Protein backbone atom coordinates (compact mmCIF):
# COMPACT_ATOMS: atom_id res chain seq x y z
CA UNK A 1 0.00 0.00 0.00
CA UNK A 2 2.82 2.37 0.86
CA UNK A 3 4.45 1.72 -2.50
CA UNK A 4 1.24 2.44 -4.41
CA UNK A 5 0.87 5.84 -2.79
CA UNK A 6 4.35 6.89 -3.91
CA UNK A 7 4.25 5.32 -7.35
CA UNK A 8 5.09 7.81 -10.08
CA UNK A 9 6.30 10.46 -7.63
CA UNK A 10 9.95 11.47 -8.02
CA UNK A 11 11.77 12.43 -4.84
CA UNK A 12 14.21 15.21 -5.71
CA UNK A 13 17.82 14.79 -4.63
CA UNK A 14 18.79 16.71 -1.50
CA UNK A 15 21.10 18.95 -3.50
CA UNK A 16 18.28 19.89 -5.87
CA UNK A 17 15.99 20.84 -3.02
CA UNK A 18 18.74 22.92 -1.48
CA UNK A 19 19.27 24.66 -4.80
CA UNK A 20 15.59 25.45 -5.08
CA UNK A 21 15.40 26.83 -1.56
CA UNK A 22 18.31 29.16 -2.28
CA UNK A 23 16.86 30.51 -5.51
CA UNK A 24 16.19 34.21 -5.29
CA UNK A 25 18.42 34.68 -2.24
CA UNK A 26 21.67 36.29 -3.42
CA UNK A 27 24.61 36.23 -1.07
CA UNK A 28 24.77 39.27 1.19
CA UNK A 29 27.88 40.25 3.12
CA UNK A 30 27.41 40.53 6.84
CA UNK A 31 26.88 44.13 7.90
CA UNK A 32 29.34 45.24 10.55
CA UNK A 33 31.12 48.39 11.66
CA UNK A 34 34.05 47.75 9.34
CA UNK A 35 31.79 47.76 6.27
CA UNK A 36 29.93 50.80 7.57
CA UNK A 37 33.19 52.69 8.06
CA UNK A 38 34.51 51.83 4.59
CA UNK A 39 31.26 52.87 2.93
CA UNK A 40 31.13 56.12 4.90
CA UNK A 41 34.69 57.06 3.92
CA UNK A 42 33.90 56.29 0.28
CA UNK A 43 30.86 58.58 0.36
CA UNK A 44 32.76 61.36 2.10
CA UNK A 45 35.57 61.03 -0.42
CA UNK A 46 33.12 61.52 -3.30
CA UNK A 47 30.61 63.95 -1.82
CA UNK A 48 32.25 65.51 1.22
CA UNK A 49 31.00 65.49 4.79
CA UNK A 50 27.66 67.07 3.92
CA UNK A 51 27.05 64.33 1.38
CA UNK A 52 27.06 61.67 4.08
CA UNK A 53 23.54 60.82 5.23
CA UNK A 54 22.21 57.77 6.99
CA UNK A 55 19.83 57.07 4.10
CA UNK A 56 22.65 57.41 1.57
CA UNK A 57 24.90 55.20 3.65
CA UNK A 58 22.24 52.49 3.84
CA UNK A 59 21.82 52.69 0.07
CA UNK A 60 25.57 52.42 -0.46
CA UNK A 61 25.61 49.31 1.71
CA UNK A 62 22.50 47.94 -0.02
CA UNK A 63 20.68 47.47 3.26
CA UNK A 64 17.55 48.89 4.81
CA UNK A 65 18.11 51.88 7.11
CA UNK A 66 16.77 49.78 9.98
CA UNK A 67 19.68 47.34 9.52
CA UNK A 68 22.13 50.23 9.72
CA UNK A 69 20.59 51.47 12.96
CA UNK A 70 21.32 48.11 14.57
CA UNK A 71 25.00 49.16 14.57
CA UNK A 72 24.97 52.97 14.81
CA UNK A 73 22.37 55.36 16.16
CA UNK A 74 23.26 58.55 14.29
CA UNK A 75 25.62 60.18 11.82
CA UNK A 76 27.88 61.19 14.69
CA UNK A 77 28.47 57.51 15.50
CA UNK A 78 29.50 56.93 11.89
CA UNK A 79 31.95 59.82 12.07
CA UNK A 80 33.47 58.39 15.23
CA UNK A 81 33.98 55.10 13.43
CA UNK A 82 35.67 56.95 10.56
CA UNK A 83 37.86 58.92 12.95
CA UNK A 84 38.90 55.81 14.85
CA UNK A 85 39.71 53.96 11.63
CA UNK A 86 41.92 56.77 10.35
CA UNK A 87 43.66 57.23 13.69
CA UNK A 88 44.46 53.50 13.75
CA UNK A 89 46.59 54.12 10.65
CA UNK A 90 48.77 56.73 12.39
CA UNK A 91 52.22 55.45 13.37
CA UNK A 92 52.87 55.66 17.12
CA UNK A 93 55.23 52.68 17.20
CA UNK A 94 58.34 54.58 18.28
CA UNK A 95 56.86 56.13 21.40
CA UNK A 96 58.44 54.42 24.40
CA UNK A 97 61.15 52.89 22.20
CA UNK A 98 63.02 55.94 20.89
CA UNK A 99 63.69 59.51 22.08
CA UNK A 100 60.43 61.46 22.19
CA UNK A 101 61.63 63.85 19.49
CA UNK A 102 62.18 61.03 17.00
CA UNK A 103 58.90 59.34 17.92
CA UNK A 104 56.97 62.60 17.62
CA UNK A 105 58.55 63.27 14.24
CA UNK A 106 57.42 59.91 12.81
CA UNK A 107 54.00 60.30 14.44
CA UNK A 108 53.46 63.78 13.00
CA UNK A 109 54.49 62.86 9.46
CA UNK A 110 52.27 59.79 9.54
CA UNK A 111 49.36 61.75 11.02
CA UNK A 112 49.62 64.39 8.31
CA UNK A 113 49.85 61.85 5.49
CA UNK A 114 46.75 59.98 6.69
CA UNK A 115 44.59 63.08 6.92
CA UNK A 116 45.93 64.62 3.71
CA UNK A 117 43.89 61.89 2.01
CA UNK A 118 40.76 62.79 3.98
CA UNK A 119 40.80 66.57 4.33
CA UNK A 120 37.02 66.84 4.10
CA UNK A 121 36.82 65.15 7.50
CA UNK A 122 39.25 67.47 9.27
CA UNK A 123 36.75 70.24 10.23
CA UNK A 124 34.50 67.60 11.79
CA UNK A 125 37.07 65.36 13.45
CA UNK A 126 39.06 68.27 14.86
CA UNK A 127 36.13 69.14 17.14
CA UNK A 128 34.55 65.69 17.53
CA UNK A 129 34.59 64.33 21.11
CA UNK A 130 36.70 61.18 21.42
CA UNK A 131 34.09 59.41 23.55
CA UNK A 132 33.81 55.73 22.58
CA UNK A 133 36.71 56.02 20.12
CA UNK A 134 39.15 53.38 21.44
CA UNK A 135 41.86 53.74 18.78
CA UNK A 136 41.93 57.51 19.20
CA UNK A 137 42.11 57.27 22.98
CA UNK A 138 44.84 54.65 22.71
CA UNK A 139 46.89 57.00 20.54
CA UNK A 140 46.51 59.82 23.05
CA UNK A 141 47.43 57.49 25.91
CA UNK A 142 50.57 56.34 24.08
CA UNK A 143 51.72 59.88 23.30
CA UNK A 144 50.87 61.13 26.79
CA UNK A 145 52.80 58.32 28.45
CA UNK A 146 55.87 59.04 26.32
CA UNK A 147 55.71 62.79 26.90
CA UNK A 148 55.37 62.27 30.65
CA UNK A 149 58.38 59.93 30.65
CA UNK A 150 60.36 62.58 28.74
CA UNK A 151 59.69 65.14 31.48
CA UNK A 152 56.82 67.15 30.03
CA UNK A 153 54.94 68.94 32.84
CA UNK A 154 51.67 67.07 33.27
CA UNK A 155 49.61 70.24 32.94
CA UNK A 156 51.15 70.96 29.52
CA UNK A 157 50.99 67.52 27.90
CA UNK A 158 47.52 67.88 26.39
CA UNK A 159 48.33 71.41 25.21
CA UNK A 160 51.46 70.06 23.54
CA UNK A 161 49.44 67.37 21.75
CA UNK A 162 46.91 69.97 20.60
CA UNK A 163 49.78 72.14 19.31
CA UNK A 164 50.98 69.22 17.20
CA UNK A 165 47.48 68.44 15.93
CA UNK A 166 46.70 72.05 15.04
CA UNK A 167 49.83 72.16 12.92
CA UNK A 168 49.25 68.70 11.45
CA UNK A 169 45.66 69.35 10.36
CA UNK A 170 46.56 72.65 8.72
CA UNK A 171 49.50 71.04 6.96
CA UNK A 172 47.28 68.23 5.66
CA UNK A 173 45.33 70.85 3.70
CA UNK A 174 48.57 72.22 2.28
CA UNK A 175 49.38 68.85 0.71
CA UNK A 176 46.37 69.15 -1.60
CA UNK A 177 46.48 72.92 -2.14
CA UNK A 178 46.48 74.06 -5.80
CA UNK A 179 49.81 75.02 -7.33
CA UNK A 180 48.64 78.57 -8.04
CA UNK A 181 47.40 79.28 -4.52
CA UNK A 182 49.83 82.20 -4.09
CA UNK A 183 49.48 83.74 -7.55
CA UNK A 184 48.84 87.48 -7.18
CA UNK A 185 47.09 87.97 -10.52
CA UNK A 186 46.58 91.59 -11.58
CA UNK A 187 48.11 92.90 -8.32
CA UNK A 188 51.44 91.20 -8.94
CA UNK A 189 53.36 94.50 -9.12
CA UNK A 190 52.31 95.45 -5.59
CA UNK A 191 54.01 92.43 -3.99
CA UNK A 192 57.60 92.37 -5.30
CA UNK A 193 59.15 90.86 -2.16
CA UNK A 194 56.57 88.13 -1.87
CA UNK A 195 56.87 87.40 -5.60
CA UNK A 196 60.65 87.04 -5.32
CA UNK A 197 60.35 84.74 -2.31
CA UNK A 198 57.72 82.68 -4.12
CA UNK A 199 59.98 82.31 -7.14
CA UNK A 200 62.91 81.26 -4.97
CA UNK A 201 60.77 78.69 -3.21
CA UNK A 202 59.92 76.95 -6.45
CA UNK A 203 63.26 75.13 -6.31
CA UNK A 204 61.65 72.89 -3.70
CA UNK A 205 60.22 69.83 -5.44
CA UNK A 206 57.68 69.22 -2.67
CA UNK A 207 56.90 72.59 -1.10
CA UNK A 208 54.27 71.15 1.25
CA UNK A 209 56.86 68.77 2.68
CA UNK A 210 59.41 71.56 3.00
CA UNK A 211 56.95 73.72 4.91
CA UNK A 212 55.87 70.83 7.13
CA UNK A 213 59.43 69.84 8.01
CA UNK A 214 60.32 73.45 8.79
CA UNK A 215 57.35 73.93 11.11
CA UNK A 216 57.59 70.51 12.73
CA UNK A 217 61.26 70.87 13.58
CA UNK A 218 60.60 74.32 15.03
CA UNK A 219 57.79 72.93 17.19
CA UNK A 220 59.86 70.00 18.43
CA UNK A 221 62.82 72.27 19.18
CA UNK A 222 60.64 74.73 21.10
CA UNK A 223 59.13 71.95 23.22
CA UNK A 224 62.57 70.45 23.84
CA UNK A 225 63.87 73.82 25.07
CA UNK A 226 60.94 74.12 27.46
CA UNK A 227 62.03 70.89 29.15
CA UNK A 228 65.51 72.17 29.95
Question: Where are the language model's segments positioned?
Answer:
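N-terminal intrinsically disordered/low-complexity leader segments
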Residues: 1-31, 192-205
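Helix-turn-helix
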Residues: 35, 39-77, 81
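Amphipathic alpha-helical interaction segments
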Residues: 35, 77, 106, 138, ...
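Short, basic, alpha-helical segments at the C-terminal edge of helix-turn-helix-like DNA-binding modules
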Residues: 83-89
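Hydrophobic alpha-helical connector segments
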Residues: 92-138, 164
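Hydrophobic alpha-helical bundle segments that form small-molecule/ligand-binding pockets
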Residues: 137-188, 201, 223-227
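C-terminal all-alpha effector/ligand-binding and dimerization domain
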Residues: 209-228
